[in-house]
Amino acid sequence: MVLVITFTLARTLLFLGSSVYTFILWFSLIVRKNLVESFPDKDLKEIKAIERKFYHFFCDYVVEVIKMFSISQKEMKRRMVFTNLDEVRAELEKNDKKFCFLYLGHYCNWEYIASLTAWIPGMHGGQIYHRIYNQAFDELFLRLRGQFGGESILMKDTLRRILTLRKQDKRVMIGFISDQLPKWENMNHWTRFLNHDTSFFIGCERIAKQVDAALYYVDVERVKRGYYRATFRLMTLHPKEYPD
């Protein structure tokens, strides 16, 4: 029996080790390929320097996300600071804006942005999310993103949920991470980005026009390891004035 258990454990560890090695190899090849294609003017030495910075950054992100499962709201507010929220709220009230949509990307620690709800008492905060294929991970990240009171809105339910929120008497602030690849049927806007022909999501713009939402870009910067600062940059208070 001991031999059987030992053999099974050894085989499992070998399988896991092989899988991890394969993933790391695949990941490193993708990173190198993307950097070389995006920055054709840089030599291999410069590319490798960017790679090293990226891997350090990514590892910090993983550790920070794990820490989020046990972090207090007080500590979270020390590590993720939103600098000009009072100005934003005053602008929304002055222009009688019920909705504020936030554009941001997968930069710095985007999971920290979900703590925004802790900074906006009296407002309904949330973020649009795409369901993770693995159910256990999906439930884990839903709990992570909702621990400070924010609502995670499934991407396919975005418009329906926002129209429901419009009937409620409160101001709403919702984050859209819009730097992923849209599905083929949603590839309506193309541009040249990082030396690639790139399609962008336009759903946020369309919904903003329907509910007359203010649009802000969330400019996130890393202050030091584990600490971030976000500044809201006004894009427009009147999205209907712009052509599709």
Predicted regions and their residues:
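Membrane-anchoring hydrophobic helices of lipid-metabolizing enzymes
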Residues: 1-104, 109, 138-143, 149-150
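Soluble catalytic domains of membrane acyltransferases
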Residues: 69-244
